[in-house]
């Protein structure tokens, strides 16, 4: 018996209830192969045939089983139902069947009653079905299937209270069994109650016991979608198609996913478009093959596609053709005709739509859908009188049927087209929206939801609203238009549910442009991802950049728009935006050329072979273009031509709404001619009632301030504005004006008044706080923030307060404020989560100063919360995806920066790599990673990242510099120098690069090439020699060529600069403490070149220390590293005094730094120098040996070189020349100009009596010291003498005496001996 197969019967009943009539027949046929001649299966097969309108076949099949006791009752009912659906009704047959039905009822069995109830339920007669099932339950209370069926009947009832009772019957029917139909009903019940987790558990029970039961998998897919889990929905859809390749539900859901979530439907060539089209084709094919004669199902399943495809012509064509075929098969189906009318509206073929709506009216004269469609067509075609006449008739009819959102929208649309009252129109639009959304209450996300949502309808309403909204971005402090808020409310559900629909997204971008300019960009970016050729999106993006003053990006965006869609150039707005940007950027001739060209554009022109119309130049746009031309001509100094164009404009637009705007523009022209009084009189004539009064007063105020320098009249203009147009915006203007003339106290009073008028304006609250800060009333600012936060509960102010406290170094209080802001229950809404992330990031900054161990924990919390936001925004606010990804990336960067500061380089690398999961092409992070690899010594990885950067941006300056550093590390000096040279040729005044080049040429032994670059920089501007960066570079160069006094002179000019000052002071201190650039602590040469005048040398040293100490008072550390640098320099000053107490104090300080910063090269070097001065040589050697093992990095190169030289000196004193030579060669490897290394090598060769080698090294020392140290010249001449090279010895002596005439020692000891040796 079929009743023994729970899955089989559940499937048949499910398909019957879902109206899959061909599926019913197929399932019954499969069952009959297993249970041949089963009357129940035969009945359902006949039922499927009957519902496909093959009535005679169905009657024949039903007659064959009507006498079987189990199905006699339902078969007789089905026969009566079938006869009544015949074209020619056989009354006698019906009478006979009705008599037979009465007879059967008298002796009917419980099973017969069950199937009769089942049939009645399936044909929609719920109350009658209940009667039969209840009667059956009285006869046989143990019949579980009857309880299940009773549950299903209640579940599908249109009465909510009845549906809630369904679970009791279902539970009673299921009991401890795995009844598939009962479990399906139970899952459906939980789904209706929006308890999706419970529903999924029940469905999982079915799939465990009946894995091949497809309806359960379909329900599971629908549940995932109801939970808004698109990933699992799609996965389940594909899993169903693996089992049933033409499953209608799976094809439909995958189509919905492609249209609603993936998008890119507008570019015909795109793969995603083909994917969307293929999904639609698959759905149509599945419907035509699996349910070939089921027009109601065809319409039910395809209608969601027409609601989501927008104006996609390919998909519209497919759907139209399919529905037309459906209509041809069943020409009496009125709903198909109205749907075709709707589709032709989408295709912008209004006349075709009108024909189909008229056809629908013929089929159903009382049908509302056909009539509303006809009215819409009349409105769209401009036949407003006809539309109004029909609408009046429809309103009368509708009174008896209740309110309809479509009818109310049509009323609003008609009023809008007839330019009737704004308030009345927007009230009707609001009512239409409320009715529309009320009909969607309780519908889970799914095909029905999208159908009811009807994005096109909401887009139409939004467009009508926008006609009455402001057309300019909101000014600071200005209240957002309530109409814009309403449009956002309308569009939010659409954008949230279907973020791939471009029309709602673009409208939302428009709303944000007018209300929240900063948030419009990310939405538009999404629009352009979906449709790179969208003219409107490109132009709006350009307007945003123009409003932000980012002209470079504005031009780039215009070019990008043209590259994607050449038709952008046909839009007058394109040329107007371009001209405005050119004007702002100062390219007046090009702006004039552009504007003159756009003026010549025809108002309307249809090109042959094109199906689009050129956008017309509207009067307001034409006025804007002419005024922009006047402005460009004025700024270009063509006042006569500007006056002529302005006069033509005044003549053309006199007496129009544009007249006042033109008057204000004329003021600038009059001012250019120096007629200040005329300009002021023109502005005074504009009265408060006129729309441009505010702009006139602002312009007047600027004239008073900038031209007449009258601050009193400047403020009076804004006070008059507040008097005539009171409100938060004008108060804000007055407050800003007072701030601009440095009267923050008065500004505070005005801001406070504005805030009382608009207490929910976040920008106003922040401005008040900032005004207190500007007035240096920090205590009042803190008190204000605290009070405002308590009164209004505005958590965003916590961040402002936290920032202020951090700025004032009140870190404990800042920590307390931010912690309090974070002490709340777990928040679920995105704005609150975003505010928490902001607080956490600020708290991490606070911890950096006094609780470093808590930084990572806090950043982890911020990233976890940001990850939650990123999971939510694609579903709820997809336009925020780019900005939120940017924030997540910035958190990863903060991790990396923290690890970098702590020298945990591997962790820093991983954190930078994590950025790429959010921003795959972030060049800044790529650069940071390359620099980090260089720091770690991973040269190949560094080169790889630099190469990627230079591929994407050939002239990337920093990448070129880094590549140069890398080439240097690889000992490819020429390649490195060439890279620096290329950068400096393009930007000779890039002093940061020049500084790096000086260091590189020094290390390459080519310092003589540097002066040419100084001359190149001077050619850029006469002001270059005054630039701090230039003087800093000159100072460093002089220091390297042994001119300490010149070096100090140039560095002094950079000492006060914010960029170069700290480095300049650092080097000045080093020069003061060691003007001759000796090896600090080195004693190997002490006896050789001792100065005769010890007291004079001591005095000079003391003067140097004193100057260094004065300089250090100007050294203001801005970071932990610069604080450490200051402590080290202070310690070196103490060390330089050579007084034991000072040296011991310095040693203690160095020990503390070395303990706090393990492996710090400067700290270990200073420690070693202190030990040497205190004659603790073994301890010094131990620290220096540690440094000898440290890998060379450019940032620590100077200190490493000093440490190697000092250790070599110690080895030389101990005659360990081999160890010394190894260190000295390392110095020369990394710095070919290290003359001290050559000097020590010469010293070693001399000690070993290898005078020729000694000469070679001293010669290099003499060359690279730039002849600044006579002692080296003396040693070179001495070794020439020892090597019997008397002529060379004499030459060197003469050189030394020429440059150092006060060095007579060389004359007596070498020159005279060499001369004597030359005499015969």
Curated annotation (Swiss-Prot):
Organism superkingdom: Eukaryota
SMART domains referenced in this protein's UniProt entry, alphabetically: TPR (SM00028)
GO CC term (a single one): cilium
Keywords: Differentiation, Disease variant, Repeat, Spermatogenesis, TPR repeat
Disulfide bonds: none
Mapped TPR repeat ranges: 4-38, 110-143, 146-180, 181-213, 215-247, 334-367, 502-534, 572-605, 728-761, 762-795, 797-828, 837-869, 889-922, 924-956, 957-990, 1028-1061, 1201-1234, 1236-1268, 1270-1303
Tissue specificity of this protein: Strongly expressed in testis.
Alphabetical GO biological process terms: flagellated sperm motility; intraciliary retrograde transport; protein localization to cilium; spermatid development
Role: Intraflagellar transport (IFT)-associated protein required for spermatogenesis. Required for sperm flagellar formation and intraflagellar transport.
Subunit structure: Interacts with IFT20. Interacts with IFT52. Interacts with IFT140. Interacts with CEP78; regulating IFT20 stability and localization.
Disease cited in the entry: Spermatogenic failure 37: An autosomal recessive infertility disorder characterized by asthenoteratozoospermia. Spermatozoa exhibit multiple morphologic abnormalities, primarily consisting of short or absent flagella, and neck defects at the head-tail junction.
Record family assignment: Belongs to the TTC21 family.
Name the UniProt record assigns to this protein: Tetratricopeptide repeat protein 21A
């Amino acid at each position: 018996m079929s009743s023994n197969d729970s899955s089989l019967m559940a499937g048949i009943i499910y398909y019957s209830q879902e109206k899959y009539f061909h599926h019913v027949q197929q399932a019954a046929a499969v069952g009959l192969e297993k249970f041949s001649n089963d009357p129940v299966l035969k009945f359902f097969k006949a039922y499927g045939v009957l519902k496909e309108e093959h009535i005679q076949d169905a009657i024949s099949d039903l007659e064959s089983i009507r006498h079987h006791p189990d199905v006699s009752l339902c078969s007789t009912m089905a026969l009566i139902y079938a006869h009544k659906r015949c074209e020619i009704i056989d009354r006698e047959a019906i009478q006979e069947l009705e008599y037979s039905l009465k007879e059967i009822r008298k002796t009917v069995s419980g099973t017969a009653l069950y199937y009769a109830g089942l049939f009645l339920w399936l044909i929609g007669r719920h109350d009658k079905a209940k009667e039969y099932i209840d009667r059956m339950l009285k006869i046989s209370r143990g019949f579980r299937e009857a309880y299940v069926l009773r549950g299903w009947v209640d579940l599908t009832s249109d009465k909510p209270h009845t549906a809630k009772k369904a679970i009791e019957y279902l539970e009673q029917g299921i009991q401890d069994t795995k009844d598939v139909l009962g479990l399906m009903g139970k899952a459906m019940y939980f789904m209706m109650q929006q308890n999706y987790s419970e529903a999924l558990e029940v469905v999982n029970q079915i799939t465990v016991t009946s894995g091949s039961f497809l309806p359960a998998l379909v329900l599971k897919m629908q549940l995932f979608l109801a939970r808004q889990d698109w990933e699992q929905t799609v996965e389940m859809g594909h899993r169903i198609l693996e089992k049933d390749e033409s499953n209608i539900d799976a094809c439909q859901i995958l189509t919905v996913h492609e249209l609603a979530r993936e998008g890119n439907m507008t570019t015909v060539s795109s793969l995603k478009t083909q994917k969307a089209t293929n999904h639609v084709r698959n759905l149509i094919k599945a419907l035509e093959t699996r349910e070939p004669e089921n027009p109601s199902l065809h319409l039910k399943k395809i209608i969601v596609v027409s609601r989501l495809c927008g104006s996609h012509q390919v998909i519209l064509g497919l759907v139209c053709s399919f529905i037309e075929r459906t209509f041809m098969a069943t020409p009496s189906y009125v709903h198909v005709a109205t749907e075709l009318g709707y589709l032709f509206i989408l295709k912008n073929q209004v006349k075709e739509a009108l024909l189909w709506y008229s056809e629908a009216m013929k089929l159903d004269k009382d049908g509302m859908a056909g009539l509303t469609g006809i009215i819409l067509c009349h409105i769209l075609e401009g036949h407003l009188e006809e539309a109004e006449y029909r609408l009046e008739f429809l309103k009368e009819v509708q009174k008896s049927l209740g309110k309809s959102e479509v009818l109310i929208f049509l009323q609003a649309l008609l009023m809008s087209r007839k330019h009737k009252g704004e308030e009345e129109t927007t009230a009707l639009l609001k009512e239409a929206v409320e009715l529309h959304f009320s009909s969607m209450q309780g519908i889970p996300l799914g095909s029905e939801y999208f159908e009811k949502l009807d994005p096109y309808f909401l887009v139409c309403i939004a467009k009508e609203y926008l006609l009455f909204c402001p057309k300019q971005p909101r000014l600071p402090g200005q209240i957002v238009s309530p109409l814009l808020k309403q449009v956002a409310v309308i569009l939010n559900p659409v954008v949230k549910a279907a973020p791939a629909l471009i029309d709602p997204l673009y409208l939302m971008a428009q709303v944000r442009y007018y209300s929240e300019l900063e948030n419009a960009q990310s939405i538009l970016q999404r629009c352009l991802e979906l449709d790179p050729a969208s003219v409107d999106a490109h132009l709006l993006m350009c307007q945003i950049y123009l409003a932000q003053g980012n002209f470079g990006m504005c031009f780039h965006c215009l070019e990008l728009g043209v590259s994607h869609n050449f038709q952008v150039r046909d839009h007058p707005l394109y040329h107007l935006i371009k001209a405005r940007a050119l004007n702002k950027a100062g390219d007046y001739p090009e702006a004039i050329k552009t504007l003159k060209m756009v003026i010549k554009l025809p108002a309307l022109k249809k090109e042959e072979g094109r199906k689009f119309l050129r956008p017309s130049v509207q009067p307001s746009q034409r006025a804007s273009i002419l005024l922009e031309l006047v402005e460009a001509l004025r700024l270009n100094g063509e006042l006569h031509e500007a006056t002529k164009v302005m006069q033509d404009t005044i003549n053309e637009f006199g007496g129009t709404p544009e007249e006042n705007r033109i008057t204000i523009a004329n003021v600038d022209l009059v001012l250019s001619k120096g007629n200040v009084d005329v300009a002021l009189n023109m502005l005074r004539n504009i009265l408060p009632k006129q729309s441009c009064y505010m702009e006139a007063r602002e312009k007047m105020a600027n004239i008073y301030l900038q031209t007449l320098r009258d601050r009193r009249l400047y403020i009076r203009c804004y006070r008059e504005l507040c008097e005539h147009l009171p409100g938060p915006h004008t108060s804000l203007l007055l407050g800003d004006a007072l701030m601009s003339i440095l009267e923050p106290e008065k500004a505070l009073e005005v801001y406070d008044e504005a805030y009382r008028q608009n207490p929910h304006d976040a920008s106003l609250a922040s401005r008040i706080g900032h005004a207190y800060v500007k007035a240096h009333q920090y205590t009042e600012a803190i008190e204000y923030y605290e009070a405002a936060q308590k009164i209004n509960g505005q958590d965003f102010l916590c961040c402002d307060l936290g920032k202020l406290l951090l700025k004032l170094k009140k870190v404990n209080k800042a920590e307390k404020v931010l912690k309090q802001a974070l002490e709340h229950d777990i928040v679920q809404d995105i704005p609150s989560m975003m505010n928490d992330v902001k607080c956490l990031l600020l708290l991490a900054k606070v911890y950096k100063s006094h609780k470093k161990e808590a930084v990572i924990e806090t950043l982890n919390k911020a990233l976890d919360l940001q990850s939650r936001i990123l999971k939510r925004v694609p579903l709820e606010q997809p336009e925020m995806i780019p900005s939120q990804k940017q924030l997540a990336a910035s958190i990863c960067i903060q991790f990396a920066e923290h690890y970098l500061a702590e020298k945990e380089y591997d962790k820093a690398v991983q954190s930078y790599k994590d950025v790429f999961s959010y921003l795959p092409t972030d060049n800044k992070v790529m650069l940071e990673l390359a620099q980090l690899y260089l720091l770690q010594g991973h040269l190949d990885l560094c080169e790889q990242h630099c190469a990627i950067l230079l591929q994407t941006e050939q002239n990337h300056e920093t990448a070129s510099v880094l590549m140069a550093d890398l080439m240097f590390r690889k000992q490819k000096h020429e390649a490195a120098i060439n890279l620096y040279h290329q950068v400096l040729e393009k930007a000779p005044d890039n002093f940061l690069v020049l500084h790096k080049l000086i260091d590189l040429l020094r290390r390459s032994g080519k310092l003589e090439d540097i002066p040419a670059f100084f001359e190149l920089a001077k050619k850029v501007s006469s002001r270059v020699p005054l630039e701090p960066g230039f003087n800093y570079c000159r100072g460093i160069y002089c220091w390297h060529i042994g001119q300490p006094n010149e070096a100090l002179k140039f560095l002094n000019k950079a000492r006060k600069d914010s960029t170069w000052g700290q480095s300049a002071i650092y080097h000045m201190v080093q020069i003061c403490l060691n003007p001759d650039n000796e090896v600090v602590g080195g004693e190997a040469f002490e006896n050789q070149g001792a100065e005769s005048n010890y007291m004079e040398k001591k005095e000079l040293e003391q003067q140097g220390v004193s100057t260094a100490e004065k300089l250090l008072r100007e050294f203001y550390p801005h970071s932990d590293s610069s604080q450490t640098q200051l402590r080290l320099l202070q310690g070196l000053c103490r060390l330089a005094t050579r007084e034991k107490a000072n040296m011991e104090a310095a040693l203690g300080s160095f020990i503390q730094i070395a303990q706090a910063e393990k492996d710090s090269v400067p700290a270990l070097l200073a420690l070693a120098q202190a030990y040497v001065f205190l004659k603790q040589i073994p301890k010094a050697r131990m620290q220096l040996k540690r440094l000898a093992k440290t890998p060379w990095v450019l940032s620590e190169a100077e200190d490493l070189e000093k440490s190697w030289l000092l250790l070599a000196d110690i080895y030389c004193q101990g005659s360990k020349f081999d160890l010394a030579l190894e260190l000295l060669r390392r110095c020369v490897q990394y710095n070919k100009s290290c003359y001290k290394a050559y000097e020590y090598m010469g010293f070693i060769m001399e000690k070993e009596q290898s005078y020729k080698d000694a000469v070679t090294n001293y010669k290099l020392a003499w060359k690279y010291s730039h002849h600044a140290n006579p002692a080296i010249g003396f040693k070179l001449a001495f070794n020439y003498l020892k090597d019997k090279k008397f002529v060379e010895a004499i030459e060197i002596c003469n050189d030394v005496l020429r440059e150092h005439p006060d060095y007579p020692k060389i004359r007596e000891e070498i020159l005279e001996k060499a001369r004597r040796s030359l005499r015969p």
